[in-house]
């Protein structure tokens, strides 16, 4: 993995920084693990925009990822590492002893030809998946389940990891990168190591078109709109909006908490660190 800064041959190339992976497979994905992916343009079944700033972009296929890691006791070999357009992390194609192939989220330092396995008896090494009760305190983990058997829901993006800091009764305590401390049931599974492609946040797309290739449309400022479109719209000449920043629907937009309390709040021992 390396960061490649482009030569300033054009205004778009001047600011571009790419993450280059020399070791990944350049061919087509494994056909049996690929599904059609339809673009919505941010519209729902009534044709109304429910998510703004989505539309266009390169046509993609969805890679079916094994988040459950439930092939206990069967050794798997890393056949190749691949790029996945649907996520920031790299993925690895695993070929199991029984002939089945599955994609998993590739951890850092996982190499082609390495062997991985799942289950309570698996050794503590990168890429292996175990229940939290079988993982030593202090271990770095990723792809963590929130309910036993449901499949990994936490720590799946590029460079993500958490640390197992305590085990007490039926709950284990995890420290996340955000500073949050959270309790998870000890029967939930996690994968050893940190997610690959940790330099993803250092890339710079360089030009607007690179965003459009990814299906991201422009974000227009509220003060540049008309009064019918946004609370900050209108006015003669350039204005500051005339009020505290709000969303197009009138809700405060700078630091206003929108998350409603849930019964799962009881599992959050300490909240995220304030910036």
From Swiss-Prot:
Cysteine pairs bridged by disulfides in the record: none
In the record, biological process GO terms are: cytoplasmic translation
- InterPro entries named among the record's database cross-references: NA-bd_OB-fold (IPR012340), Rib_uL2_dom2 (IPR014722), Ribosomal_uL2 (IPR002171), Ribosomal_uL2_bac/org-type (IPR005880), Ribosomal_uL2_C (IPR022669), Ribosomal_uL2_CS (IPR022671), Ribosomal_uL2_dom3 (IPR014726), Ribosomal_uL2_RNA-bd_dom (IPR022666)
GO MF terms listed in the record are:
rRNA binding; structural constituent of ribosome; transferase activity
Arranged from A to Z, the UniProt key words for this protein are: Ribonucleoprotein, Ribosomal protein, RNA-binding, rRNA-binding
The UniProt entry, under Gene3D superfamilies, shows:
2.30.30.30, Nucleic acid-binding proteins (2.40.50.140), Ribosomal protein L2, domain 3 (4.10.950.10)
What job does the chain carry out? One of the primary rRNA binding proteins. Required for association of the 30S and 50S subunits to form the 70S ribosome, for tRNA binding and peptide bond formation. It has been suggested to have peptidyltransferase activity; this is somewhat controversial. Makes several contacts with the 16S rRNA in the 70S ribosome.
Q: Describe its assembly.
A: Part of the 50S ribosomal subunit. Forms a bridge to the 30S subunit in the 70S ribosome.
| Protein's UniProt name | Large ribosomal subunit protein uL2
């Amino acid at each position: 993995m390396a960061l490649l800064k482009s030569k300033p041959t054009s205004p778009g190339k001047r600011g571009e920084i790419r993450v280059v992976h020399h070791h990944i497979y350049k061919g087509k994905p494994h056909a049996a693990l690929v599904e059609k992916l339809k673009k919505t343009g941010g519209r729902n079944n009534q044709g109304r925009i429910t998510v703004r700033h989505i539309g266009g972009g390169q046509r993609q296929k969805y890679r079916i990822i094994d988040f459950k890691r439930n092939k206990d006791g069967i050794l798997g070999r890393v056949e190749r590492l691949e790029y996945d357009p649907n996520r920031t992390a790299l993925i690895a194609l695993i070929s199991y002893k029984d002939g089945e192939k599955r994609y998993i989220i590739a951890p850092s330092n996982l190499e082609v030809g390495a062997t991985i396995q799942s289950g309570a008896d698996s050794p503590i090494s990168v890429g292996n998946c175990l229940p939290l009760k079988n993982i030593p305190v202090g271990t770095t983990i990723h792809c963590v389940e929130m309910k036993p058997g449901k499949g990994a829901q936490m720590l799946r993006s590029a460079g993500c990891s958490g640390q197992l800091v305590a085990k007490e009764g039926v709950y284990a305590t995890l420290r996340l990168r955000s500073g949050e401390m959270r309790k998870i049931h000890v029967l939930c599974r996690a994968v050893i190591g940190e997610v690959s492609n940790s330099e993803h946040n250092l890339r710079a797309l360089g030009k607007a078109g690179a965003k459009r290739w990814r299906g991201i449309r422009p974000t227009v400022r509220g003060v540049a709109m008309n009064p019918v479109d946004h609370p900050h719209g209108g006015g003669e000449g350039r204005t500051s909006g005339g009020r505290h920043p709000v969303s197009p629907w009138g809700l405060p937009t700078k630091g206003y908490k929108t998350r409603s309390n849930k019964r799962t709040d009881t599992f959050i021992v300490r909240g995220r660190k304030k910036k």
